Amino acid sequence: MASEKKLSNPMREIKVQKLVLNISVGESGDRLTRAAKVLEQLSGQTPVFSKARYTVRSFGIRRNEKIACYVTVRGDKAMQLLESGLKVKEYELLRRNFSDTGCFGFGIQEHIDLGIKYDPSTGIYGMDFFVVLERPGYRVGRRRRCKARVGIQHRVTKDDAMKWFQVKYEGVILNKSQAIV
């Protein structure tokens, strides 16, 4: 009976809080709406548009112009999309893909690698995956009433995130010199 119980503390287990899929087109108009359609097809949710913060004349971008779209996915759908995204990357990430706060991100070149059928009218879009990891109890930092800080011992660190990735997905973490592009 005792051997069946987990010896690890359930409050220390790391889980995916959310997955953010981002497609940055760099211009508003038809290409951006087609990119939004790709995200909606992939996630089943309506994407949100991001605006440019300031004007960049060399790129032809004006301030407050819609230039990108993103969607935030949580729960089982997030795990499913993350699995398919990591499969495209062959479960290999660089060490620099992980942040100090325990989050990680990566990009893919073509959205059709995720299993969406190619549509000539839509085209092919690359996208970024951003994964936010947390432990149970992180709500104390987000709640409205009696807000508190998450303790240093309880926060997810870069090493924790890399270890979680290696154990959960049997992933490989490469240094910059090992990466073959």
UniProtKB/Swiss-Prot annotation:
GO terms for cellular component: cytoplasm; nucleus; ribonucleoprotein complex; ribosome. Coiled coil: none annotated. InterPro entries: Ribosomal_uL5, Ribosomal_uL5_C, Ribosomal_uL5_CS, Ribosomal_uL5_dom_sf, Ribosomal_uL5_N. Keywords: Cytoplasm, Nucleus, Ribonucleoprotein, Ribosomal protein, RNA-binding, rRNA-binding. Pfam families: Ribosomal_L5, Ribosomal_L5_C. GO terms for biological process: translation. GO terms for molecular function: rRNA binding; structural constituent of ribosome. Its main location: nucleus. The keyword Flavoprotein does not apply. It is found in: Nucleus; Cytoplasm. Component of the large ribosomal subunit. Component of the ribosome, a large ribonucleoprotein complex responsible for the synthesis of proteins in the cell. The small ribosomal subunit (SSU) binds messenger RNAs (mRNAs) and translates the encoded message by selecting cognate aminoacyl-transfer RNA (tRNA) molecules. The large subunit (LSU) contains the ribosomal catalytic site termed the peptidyl transferase center (PTC), which catalyzes the formation of peptide bonds, thereby polymerizing the amino acids delivered by tRNAs into a polypeptide chain. Belongs to the universal ribosomal protein uL5 family. This is Large ribosomal subunit protein uL5. The gene is RPL11.
